[in-house]
């Protein structure tokens, strides 16, 4: 059992109960902004804006500072958050903005430790580096303190626990942080946001280590559901319930500020830039240069920028997060481990709704480690839930029969799905061994020379075939679409003149099929819920119905615009030819900016006659598929994440790969 107590109540009231200058180390991870709801009123992290969240924490940590000894240390682990903006989410830089305001409030910033998580969860994100680290801010009341600086990067895996708390930080992280302090027997350790009591559990174990420490711990927790867990982990029996105290706070106000130095305008590549500044002053000049007309006129609107700084200051970590009000979005703060230190590189893109930026993550992926079964047991799939989000009205269904399988591993290829709206359909399933490659297998070929095109339609520049140098995506030069032989053969085994895979079967047609020699023969109609319920496969728990191909929206919009012009139509004419509910939808199909959308399969059926669409083009737009939903890395490899161990001379080449146009990249 560890010596200490649990204060059950809000953090501000609990801190006020503590004696001033009594705590040697405070160590905590408060609720992140807008991350989750812990189920009680007045909880921290539910504020409307990040500015309110930061302002509130400043007030709380001001109270904490009064309780800290003069040589005490405060470890603050706090995660960042993205804020959506026109489809491009902006990294808010909450930890570093908070640190800057805490310094203004009287704290001393002693260190910023990077906690890298080697076993971070895989992510499907493709337009930036996935998040793999969190900062630990180290504060003190004075320069004379018990903190000992060590390597500022900790590589500690996430820790699995039996407790239902999604934000448990590992015991090893707590022990590593405490080991950096010169602690004495009898010292008090405080965790003002105790959660499941990890800090207390570590302090308890320190009593039995090789060089034992007999420490006291105070844990503050507002969530009642965590009290039993804390008691179990720490053995602390003393729980004091507190009444809430009212307190007020003001949102912070951050403004972009520059020195009087001359801007440094980087203009080398219209598609993007990579530059590592030597120091804070040079970095500030680069950011100033980004706001200049010369910089913005030179670069394409879909360019990507990587600007870093070696000998950085805290203000450099704050600055890029403030560019959201000046025309740029911060997508990543990438950490580069550099010997005994680290430095940041910021991924920035233009804040525009006209086009999406060009970022090719596939070029730098790491080799995947996902292991799939050699053979699949077909029984695992009967009764499996199917979620259809490709229809106008989302619906659920379940697999009722397996028509055919892939020969190499018995994974279902064609299945019958019974839907909750009393329809039934045959669906093509993607084999997890090659699902991503199939979804990106649609080829666009030059109508002049037949060369497979590399670049998608460019709404900002000239569209020229890189081989024959002739115009493409014009009125009479739309690229020809080609499907893979594997897909064509799989679908032709089922489809005939009357049916396309993925379509609902009408009751009368279904009855006719059962009496024929078709793939539906002998299949009995099943009532919703009557089949074996929602079995889970080895690595997945449902299928999702989605588009067979990953289509570039501006490219599809270009095709539709050409067809509209060929038929001498306007958007107004198309809207009038469709049912009234399409009034606010049609215009989005022809937009090539962030407001654009691709018609759903049922929409394409209506557009075929109006626009006289090429049958093959329409068929491709209507193609659908079932994909097994499971947590696995991309077959192309793992997103490398925002923590890199690269020498500076290799870093520029590495990052430049991510925005280099495909035709240039292949030549390299």
Curated annotation (Swiss-Prot):
Keywords: DNA-binding, Methyltransferase, Restriction system, S-adenosyl-L-methionine, Transferase. This is Type II methyltransferase M.MwoI. The gene is mwoIM. The lineage of its organism: Archaea, Methanobacteriati, Methanobacteriota, Methanomada group, Methanobacteria. Its EC number is 2.1.1.113. It catalyses: a 2'-deoxycytidine in DNA + S-adenosyl-L-methionine = an N(4)-methyl-2'-deoxycytidine in DNA + S-adenosyl-L-homocysteine + H(+). Transmembrane segments: none annotated. Belongs to the N(4)/N(6)-methyltransferase family. N(4) subfamily. It is an enzyme of class 2 (transferase). It comes from the Archaea.
